[in-house]
Amino acid sequence: MTSRTEAVKAYLLDLQDRICSALETEDGGARFVEDAWVREAGGGGRTRVIGDGKVIEKGGVNFSHVFGAGLPPSASAHRPELAGRGFEALGVSLVIHPYNPHVPTSHANVRFFIAEKEGEEAVWWFGGGFDLTPYYGNEEDCVHWHRVAEQACAPFGADVYPRYKAWCDRYFHLKHRGEPRGIGGLFFDDLNEWDFDTCFAFIRAIGDAYINAYLPIVQRRKDTPYTPQQREFQEYRRGRYVEFNLVYDRGTLFGLQSGGRTESILMSLPPQVRWGYDWKAAPGSEEARLTEYFLQDRDWLGQ
């Protein structure tokens, strides 16, 4: 490993530890179970899963560091000049699915890629972000989530949050449904526009911001009473989450195409999901308001 890779790996392992500790404390019941694994083609990781807690129905916080002789198609499709290069990929990826329909699902990811070829300069880039998927929308939560995202981006330029917020809105979009997966946040990829140290500092700012963005929302909503019908709606909306991850998500596709660990890759899927044929929310209901108001391309900070 190069010194850069070592520095990124040390940060990601520490980030995984800190996020798991914070989520365990907030749940107050369940503990993460670690499954360390080795990839035959090169590398390995630490999968940590939690479930059946007081707050978290299912969740996972994964670290992986894999390498190989050639980039898989999902990683080189938009950069064909990198096809055939050897690669290293490091990242932390997490998804948290709470029981309570009033607590949104959250997702975060930070990652680092290096593509190398003998006799040529190594090409590196970072990617990541975090996004929120509510089932019953709350404006206070949406504003808080985006405010933390904006504050994390602010030291790196006034244009960074608007650019990566818009990218998130475009990326987490179910084309076949014509709707977004959630209320967005930040998404970026192929980040090497600054020098390495600045890009690495930005990744740390985003990774460190996740807990500050998510835990206050969990704390506000976890004790909100809910009905069996609201739970059913949560499971119905979770179906959209499954559809996106299996059809569009670049991280899922990269993992499967690169021979990654299937159990860890599919850890993001919720435990209870339902699909109903041509289901429609009642006009004027909270369920209808989710798509009509919250799942829209909206400037939550009023900028």
UniProtKB/Swiss-Prot annotation:
It comes from the Bacteria. Pathway: Porphyrin-containing compound metabolism; protoporphyrin-IX biosynthesis; protoporphyrinogen-IX from coproporphyrinogen-III (O2 route): step 1/1. The active site is at residue 107. Pfam families: Coprogen_oxidas. The record marks 176 as: Important for dimerization. It is found in: Cytoplasm. PROSITE patterns: COPROGEN_OXIDASE (PS01021). GO terms for molecular function: coproporphyrinogen oxidase activity; metal ion binding; protein homodimerization activity. It catalyses: coproporphyrinogen III + O2 + 2 H(+) = protoporphyrinogen IX + 2 CO2 + 2 H2O. PANTHER family: COPROPORPHYRINOGEN III OXIDASE, MITOCHONDRIAL, OXYGEN-DEPENDENT COPROPORPHYRINOGEN-III OXIDASE, MITOCHONDRIAL. Homodimer. Involved in the heme biosynthesis. Catalyzes the aerobic oxidative decarboxylation of propionate groups of rings A and B of coproporphyrinogen-III to yield the vinyl groups in protoporphyrinogen-IX. Belongs to the aerobic coproporphyrinogen-III oxidase family. This is Oxygen-dependent coproporphyrinogen-III oxidase.
